[in-house]
Amino acid sequence: MGLLDGNPANETSLVLLLFADFSSMLGCMAVLIGFWRLKLLRNHVTKVIACFCATSFCKDFPSTILTLTNTAVNGGFPCYLYAIVITYGSFACWLWTLCLAISIYMLIVKREPEPERFEKYYYLLCWGLPLISTIVMLAKNTVQFVGNWCWIGVSFTGYRFGLFYGPFLFIWAISAVLVGLTSRYTYVVIHNGVSDNKEKHLTYQFKLINYIIVFLVCWVFAVVNRIVNGLNMFPPALNILHTYLSVSHGFWASVTFIYNNPLMWRYFGAKILTVFTFFGYFTDVQKKLEKNKNNNNPSPYSSSRGTSGKTMGGHPTGDDVQCSSDMEQCSLERHPNMVNNQQNLNNNYGLQQNYNDEGSSSSSLSSSDEEKQTVEMQNIQISTSTNGQGNN
C-alpha cells in the first residue's frame, strides 16, 4: 500500500500528520539550540523545558520515519514501535509539563531556594511512569493499526482511557490547579501595589498560564475524538483536529517558550533577519536585536522599594514580592533573618541573590538607628532566563 491511498480525508490527515511532526521537531530543536547557545538561559526551569523538548523530539523523529516508510500498516515490529513511541513519548511530555507547573509554583509561591534538588525525582517520574502504561498496552495485546498510526485498537476503549487519556486528564487537572494558585498569588501581589507598571502585568499573567492553555488545546480534541470513537462514530473533521493538534504539541509549546523569553526571540530574530540584511531589508531592526540579544529585561530589583515584611489581609504586600511584566523575572524580597540562612545557595539555575546594604537600596530609612541597619534582600528569578552575567 502506498503512502497515499486516494481517500481525500485520509490524505489530508496524513499530510497534516507529517506537517505536525516536522514542525514539532523544528520547534523543539530551536529551543534546544537556544538553550545551548545562550548561557543566560541555563537555569532549573529551562532545564525542565529542555527535557520536554528533548522528549518531544525523540517521540516525533521515529514517528515521522515510520509514517514516511509506511511500514507500520502491515503490523509486526514497526507497528508495535509506533504504538510505544506514541504512548511513552506523549505521556512523558505531559509529565514534563506538570513538572514545569510544579517548578514555577515552588519558585514563586513557596520560594524554594534549591529547586534543582527535585530534578532527580522529575527524571524518575517523567521517564519512568510512562513505562507502566506502555508495558500494560503491550502485555494485553491491544496494539492495532488505527488509521495513520498504530496504537490501542478501537475495540479497547477502556484501555485507551485507563492507560492514556485518564492519566492525561489527571495530569492536566493538577497542572491547572498549580498554575491557578501561582496566578492567584501574583495577582494578589500585583494588586497590593507591587509595581508602577500594572498595565503590563496582564502580559505577565498570560505568560504564567499560556503553556498550560497550549497543553489543553493540543489534546482536548484527542480526548473528545476518542470518546466519540467509543460510540462508534468517526467524524473526519474531529479526527483531523485530533491528528494535527496532538502531534504538534511540541511545536506550539516551543513557540510558547520562545515567546515567553525575550532573550531567545531576540537571538532567533537577529539570526533570521541577518538573511534579509544582505538585500538591504530590516537592517536597523537586526542591529537592534543583535545588540540586545543578551540583554534581559530590567530586574525588578532595580525599582525596589525596600523590605517591610508587611502583609495585607494575610497576603504578601508589594514590598514582599516584586514581579516584572515578563514571565522570566520575579523577585522575592525576604527579611534579613530569612536571607542569612541562604547565603551559600547555588545561583546556576535561576536563583540569583543580591545582598545589598542600605546605601545601595532604592529606599532610604528615616531614623538614624534604621540607617545603621543592613537591609538584605534576595532576588529569585524564575522561568526561562536569569538576569546575570553570561556569554553567548
Curated annotation (Swiss-Prot):
Keywords: G-protein coupled receptor, Glycoprotein, Membrane, Phosphoprotein, Receptor, Transducer, Transmembrane, Transmembrane helix
Full protein name: Cyclic AMP receptor 1
Family in the record: Belongs to the G-protein coupled receptor 5 family.
PROSITE patterns the record matches: G_PROTEIN_RECEP_F2_4
Consequence recorded when altering I102T: In DN2; constitutive phosphorylation and greatly increased affinity for cAMP
Transmembrane segments: 14-33, 48-68, 84-109, 121-139, 163-181, 206-224, 236-260
Phosphoserine sites (modified residues): S299, S302, S303, S304, S308, S360, S361, S362, S363, S364, S366, S367, S368
SUPFAM superfamilies membership: Family A G protein-coupled receptor-like
Gene3D superfamilies for this protein: Rhodopsin 7-helix transmembrane proteins
Ranges per topology, Extracellular: 1-13, 69-83, 140-162, 225-235
Region described as Disordered: spans on this chain: 292-324, 339-392
GO molecular function terms attached to this record: adenylate cyclase activator activity; cAMP binding; cAMP receptor activity; G protein-coupled chemoattractant receptor activity; G protein-coupled receptor activity; GTPase regulator activity; pathogen-derived receptor ligand activity; protein kinase activator activity
Low complexity: compositionally biased ranges: 340-367
Reported function: Receptor for cAMP. Coordinates the aggregation of individual cells into a multicellular organism and regulates the expression of a large number of developmentally regulated genes. The activity of this receptor is mediated by G proteins.
GO CC, any one term: cytosol
